[in-house]
Amino acid sequence: NAISISLNSETFGEILDRLKEVLTFIDGKINVASGDSMTTLKYRFESEIPPVTQLKLKIETNCREHFAELGWERKYFTVSSEWYKGECFITTYKLEELLGTKLRALYQRRKGRDLYDFLRAFQQHSLDTTAILQCYRKYMEFSVGQVPSKKEFLLNMEEKMKNENFIGDITALIRPEEKYNQEEAFELIKKELIEKM
C-alpha cells in the first residue's frame, strides 16, 4: 500500500493523472475509485519472486485530512531500481506522525502488516513515542470523535492476534528469507505504545 495526502482541499484530478502517468511501467490492470474522503488507484500484477503470485498495489490519497499535527517536512527522495531511476524532494509527515496514523490503522483494520511496519520503524529509528501517541489521538478524534482506552486497544489487538488473516497477511509481502515474528512485533508495540496510552 502507498498512502498520500492532499495538502489542501483543491481538486485532485491533475495529481491523479500524473500518478497514472508515472506508474505506466507497471504491467497490469488499473482501477480508480473516488469517494468523499479518498481516491484510490489499484493495480494488479504478478510478483517477480517465485512462487509467482498475483499482487496488488493500492495507492490511497486522503482527500479529507488537510493537516499535519507535527508540521510538514521536506525530504530528499531517490529511487533506483530496474524499472525506474529518479530523485526529488517530497513534502511529507514527520515519521512519528506517519506512525500515529499507522497506530490508528492498526486499531481500525485487520492488517497484520501494520505490526511489521512498526517493528521495522522501531528497529531502524530512534522514535518519540509521546509524539506518536499525540498524533494517534489527534487522528482518532478527527476520524471517529473518540479515542479508545488502553484496555479497548489491547483487547482489540489480542483478538486480532488470534485471527489467521491478520497474522498471515504479511507473508506475500516479505522475502522468504526474511525473519519476522508477529508475536515479537506485537509485544514491542504493546510495551512501547499501548502501555503508554
Question: Predicted segment positions?
Answer:
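Structured mid-to-C-terminal alpha-helical surface segments
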Residues: 2-197
